[in-house]
Amino acid sequence: MKIKATIERIPGGMMLVPLVLGAILNTLAPNTGAYFGGFTKGMISGTVPILAVWFFCIGASINLRATGTVLRKSGTLVLTKIAVAWVVAMGCAMFIPENGIQTGFFAGLSVLAIVSAMDMTNGGLYASLMNQYGTKEESGAFVLMSLESGPLVTMLILGSAGLASFEPHHFVGAVLPFLIGFALGNLDTDLRDFFSKATPVLIPFFGFALGNTINLNVIMDTGLLGIVLGVAVIIITGIPLIIADRVIGGGNGTAGVAASSAAGAAVANPMIIAQINPSFEPVAASATALVAASVIVTAILVPIITALYAKRYGNIPKADVEPQPVESLHH
């Protein structure tokens, strides 16, 4: 049976399929982990330790000796995305209550959901698209996008926008596994090769564990809003990214479009941040559902929009540009 190949036909399938399976299990039998205990409970409820190992491996995979062109391109996209998310957070904080919107079409929407969806780029999706529509340097620009992985950037945005306060050691704790992996990977290339191979392997496991924090009834309540959020992520972050890529990065804007997605790892951020700062617990469940929906929407739409943009503004023959399904959302 071609189970893996079938799953990979779905955009981000290696994370989203286990996530949906976990959500189904949590909705129909929420006490499964407690009932079985042991290793079964660990797989069901181990989101944080699994993500910690994944974050370590992400750090180990980054090569400090990347070329200047790659670093300029990558830095431009990463800083632009973070800056846009910060501006949006500042603006939304003026209108959205601390515990999120409770009624109407926007019920469940919170600043936590918006920032989590906007401040990270799907590095795997970006790299795949740039392999097809960009240059080698543009493809390699995903190197710094790994720095966005995990809750650190979201915490910094929420903190600097005055929406939350975190103790300094919480920031250190959020990034320490990444830094240790980064150091080891650059001290020994064999360790980099060894640990980087584990990055895609861990994705289904934290997807399943994360799914077990989601109740499908919440997703049903926020489904259409999640689609709207996904489209908003593409528009609100995509336009500044295109401009930054053309003006600062020296590209034609295609890389900016390809970087306008929501990262699969962002789905975990609301829950992790709520564990660090309990004031976010009331909105964590709905934020997780909204971010998951926006990840799916952007994973489907961004490849199509990137192909159309490259066809019109790129430096490649139009006949060679057809939207292709992209199989993963690694970062």
UniProtKB/Swiss-Prot annotation:
It comes from the Bacteria. GO terms for molecular function: 2-keto-3-deoxygluconate:proton symporter activity. The chain crosses the membrane at residues 10-30, 42-62, 77-97, 100-120, 141-161, 163-183, 200-220, 224-244, 254-274, 289-309. One of its GO terms (cellular component) is plasma membrane. It holds the Pfam family KdgT. Keywords: Cell inner membrane, Cell membrane, Membrane, Sugar transport, Symport, Transmembrane, Transmembrane helix, Transport. Its main location: membrane. It is a multi-pass membrane protein. It is found in: Cell inner membrane. It catalyses: 2-dehydro-3-deoxy-D-gluconate(in) + H(+)(in) = 2-dehydro-3-deoxy-D-gluconate(out) + H(+)(out). Catalyzes the proton-dependent uptake of 2-keto-3-deoxygluconate (KDG) into the cell. Belongs to the KdgT transporter family. This is 2-keto-3-deoxygluconate permease. The gene is kdgT.
